[in-house]
């Protein structure tokens, strides 16, 4: 939890003590109600199990709600990868904990360096899709291009995750029509109505915070308008399943939905915890958000944003708006970039060191 974050960051960042190790700041883990604590443990266990990770050093203070034994049990239920534990209150304080954690991490990095790269079929790929800082070009170009890429992943036998439940509101009926069966159909309506209910319970309306000021400045006027653009990221494939926040997503599942908030770092965290190896993230206004574990490919449909934020954006879908390329061509180009990224090519967010992450709470935010 947050009291133990310094040890992880010291292990990874100060003087670059362990090349190849990453950490993340966990704001949760203590003083949480049971559902929130479950979210926290699901995210941490999912991170440890993600295919991009070789092994995990779990650091705790020792007195938090998310006790070490609970976290370790959650991780071991998902994976048998190397796992070490450090409890600050039991090893002699922060400096001693850093020393021990660094030693464990260096041992894991040495072991991981002995592994050989292997080829895997596209059917093993799990791609998470996200949008943030949207403007009208997101719904017109960037998200349709992501949707075309998503359809290609599904056609190859892989898995694509559509997220951000708050941005299904007003378009949930369109998604529900694509459900593979009644159970999935009903779950789509369930998660959207539950999301709105979280706000009604405290006397709020989800539309008071969504669209955001940036969305409105870009030209989006209503939540329904934003939702109609958001769901384009799911392409045209049937929807095969609806997963709860941060739960393990099986490979070769086709198009699935994960119940996440619209908050970008918290939504991306859930998909990575679910097993996504790569995130594809559209932003009409421009966003620097990355992730410590999974590379984030940034897409914009706005050529002005692409020029203004070239340091942050990997792929421009604006040619669709100007009739220079078809959505199918852009989908193929984007899939090629995703494959290159999965093979090790750095994204702009990785190169700049953006590693934002957050964990949702049971009373969801916009």
Task: Describe each region flagged by the PLM.
Residues 10, 15-16, 25-26, 51, ...:
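Anaerobic metallocofactor- and corrinoid-dependent redox/one-carbon enzyme cores
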Residues 1-8, 13:
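Single conserved hydrophobic/aromatic residue that forms the stacking wall/gate
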Residues 3, 89-92, 96, 133, ...:
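Short coil/turn segments at secondary-structure junctions
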Residues 10, 14-23, 28-115, 124-126, ...:
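Alpha/propeptide regions of enzymes that mature by internal proteolysis
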């Amino acid at each position: 939890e947050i009291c133990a974050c310094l040890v992880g960051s010291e292990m990874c960042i100060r003087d670059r003590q362990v090349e190849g190790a990453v950490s993340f700041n966990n704001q949760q883990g203590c003083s949480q109600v049971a559902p929130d604590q479950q979210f926290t443990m699901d995210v941490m266990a999912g991170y440890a199990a993600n295919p991009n990770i070789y092994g995990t050093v779990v650091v705790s203070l020792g007195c938090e709600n998310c006790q070490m034994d609970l976290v370790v049990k959650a991780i071991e239920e998902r994976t048998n990868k190397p796992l070490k534990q450090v409890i600050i209150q039991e090893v002699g304080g922060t400096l001693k904990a850093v020393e021990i954690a660094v030693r464990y991490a260096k041992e894991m990095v040495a072991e991981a360096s002995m592994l050989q790269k292997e080829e895997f079929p596209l059917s093993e790929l799990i791609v998470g899709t996200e949008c943030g800082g949207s403007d009208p070009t997101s719904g017109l170009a960037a998200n349709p291009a992501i949707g075309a890429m998503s359809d290609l992943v599904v056609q190859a036998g892989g898995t694509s995750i559509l997220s951000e439940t708050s941005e299904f509101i007003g378009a949930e009926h369109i998604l529900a029509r694509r459900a593979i069966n009644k159970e999935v159909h009903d779950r789509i309506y369930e998660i959207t109505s539950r999301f709105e209910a979280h706000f009604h319970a405290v006397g709020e309306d989800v539309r008071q915070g969504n669209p955001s000021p940036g969305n409105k400045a870009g030209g989006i006027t209503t939540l329904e308008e934003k939702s109609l653009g958001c769901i384009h990221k799911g392409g045209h494939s049937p929807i095969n399943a609806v997963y709860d926040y941060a739960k393990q997503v099986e490979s070769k599942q086709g198009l699935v939905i994960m119940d996440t908030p619209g908050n970008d770092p918290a939504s991306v965290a859930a998909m990575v915890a679910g097993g996504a190896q790569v995130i594809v993230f559209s932003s009409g206004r421009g966003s620097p958000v990355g992730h410590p574990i999974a590379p984030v490919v940034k897409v914009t449909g706005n050529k002005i944003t692409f020029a203004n934020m070239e340091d942050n954006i990997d792929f421009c879908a604006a040619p669709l708006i100007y009739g220079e390329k078809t959505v199918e061509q852009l989908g193929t180009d984007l899939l090629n970039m995703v494959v290159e990224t999965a093979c090790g090519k750095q994204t702009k967010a990785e190169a700049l060191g953006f590693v934002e992450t957050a964990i949702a709470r049971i009373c969801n935010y916009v």
